Structure formats: structure tokens, C-alpha cells
Design a protein with these regions (language model features):
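Flexible, low-complexity charged segments
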Residues: 1-125
Length: 125
């Protein structure tokens, strides 16, 4: 009896592997530039562009397209909170990439996930 319970736990408790290869996940780059005024940086503007690798392939891009406005608002909020010191950090783009990746997967997307975030443009004016 214990063996049967153990087998059921093993087979029912594990989720199947994804039915897609993560390398085949499409890129979403239709968001356009996001412009913000950083915190305490009067007269300076930050403009960034992002591309997202979204999985699973069929539903990933559809969900991120549906949530485009929410995504842009969340990015604007994140970028507006950046300080002058943060904008001068040599690792600013890498940090922004990680922050955006977490933000999108935790707050925006519910049924799909961003696998990679690419910063395809970054300019402080």
C-alpha cells in the first residue's frame, strides 16, 4: 500500500516538462520607447526600449500584447523612481534588466513568463 501511495505522489505531484523549447519562444518588441523623468533629476529625461522573450510561444506574445498599457505604466513607474546616482552607475543597464524581468513576471504576466529582457535602447538626456 505504501508503495502505491509513493508512486502516486511521484507521478501526480510532478508537472510535465513544457511542450516547447525555450529557444523557440518569440520576441516582443512592439512596446515602443518608454520615456520618464527620473526622481530628482530636474531637466533630465530617461528613454529606454525593451524587447521581451516570452514563453510559451503561442500564448506569450498574445498576453503581453493584451497587457501592453499595464506594462508601459509599470515601466514608467520603475524608471521614474530612478535617482541620478542610479543613472550614473556603470551597471545601470544590467540592474534595469533584472528589475524589469522581475516586475513583468510578478506583476504583469499571469499565464505566461518572460524568459529574457533585452534593453535595446537607453539614453539619458
Amino acid at each position: 500500500m505504501r508503495a502505491l501511495v509513493a508512486l502516486l505522489a511521484v507521478f501526480c505531484g510532478c508537472s510535465p516538462p513544457p511542450s516547447y523549447d525555450k529557444d523557440d519562444c518569440p520576441l516582443y518588441s512592439e512596446l515602443g520607447p518608454v520615456r520618464a523623468n527620473p526622481a530628482g533629476a530636474m531637466g533630465r529625461n530617461l528613454e529606454a526600449q525593451f524587447t521581451f522573450k516570452v514563453c510559451p510561444p503561442e500564448t506569450g506574445v498574445a498576453e503581453i500584447r493584451r497587457k501592453r498599457i499595464e506594462l508601459k505604466q509599470a515601466l514608467l513607474k520603475l524608471m521614474s523612481a530612478k535617482t541620478t546616482d542610479a543613472l550614473e552607475d556603470p551597471l545601470r543597464i544590467e540592474k534595469l534588466q533584472r528589475e524589469v524581468h522581475l516586475l513583468v513576471n510578478k506583476e504583469i504576466l499571469k499565464k505566461t513568463k518572460v524568459q529574457e529582457v533585452y534593453v535595446t535602447g537607453f539614453e539619458v538626456k
